[in-house]
Design a protein with these regions (language model features):
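Eukaryote-skewed repeat-based solenoidal scaffolds used as protein-protein interaction platforms
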Residues: 1-100, 104-110
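Alpha/beta catalytic cores of nucleotide-metabolism and tRNA/nucleoside-modifying enzymes
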Residues: 36-38, 72-88, 94-167
């Protein structure tokens, strides 16, 4: 890692490390490595670790992913998360998950195509969010001609998404 940091530290742009692992111990070990040893500007945490289904078992895997990441972050924020380092959340199981993080000032950014994909598929967010998720990637929808109804749903979803994130 020291050699990698020496060779690539001065490249333009920001460096982001993505936490990997299948157990709480692996996640914590990888997170700690990213925080203390990897010369990264930001730490990213994914939405679909298999671990989440063990942390928060639910018949709906997307609910497990949402609640599992929220529970993991709540536990890690007590004494593991470096609140002085920016964090990024990769994707989401369900978009309303981001409402759970409004007090986590260390989360600097999130990314998801969820509002767009669901709008294209004609699915408008409800006030509570969604209960399921379309499993199609935005890249597979790039050539779709967007109707006025789909555009309305996309904008509707983006507005709801903003309220989940910002309150």
């Amino acid at each position: 890692m020291d050699q990698w940091n020496r060779n690539y530290r001065n490249l333009p742009g920001k460096k982001i490390g993505v936490v990997q692992g299948k157990t709480p111990e692996e996640i914590i070990e990888c997170y700690t490595f990213m925080d203390k040893h990897a010369d990264v500007d930001k730490i990213a945490i994914s939405f679909d670790y298999s671990l989440y289904e063990q942390i928060a078992p639910h018949e709906n895997k997307y609910m497990s992913w949402m609640l599992g990441r929220a529970m993991m972050l709540a536990n890690m924020s007590q004494d593991i998360i470096n609140k002085n380092k920016p964090h990024h959340l990769l994707g989401c199981g369900l978009p309303q998950e981001f409402a759970l993080y409004q007090d986590y000032k260390w989360i600097e950014s999130v990314d998801t195509s969820n509002p767009i994909v669901h709008g294209i598929k004609g699915i408008a967010y409800k006030h509570y969010g969604l209960q399921t998720k379309e499993s199609i990637k935005l890249v597979d929808l790039l050539d779709v001609d967007i109707s006025n109804e789909q555009l309305y749903d996309i904008n509707h979803n983006i507005n709801y998404f903003r309220t989940y994130v910002n309150g």
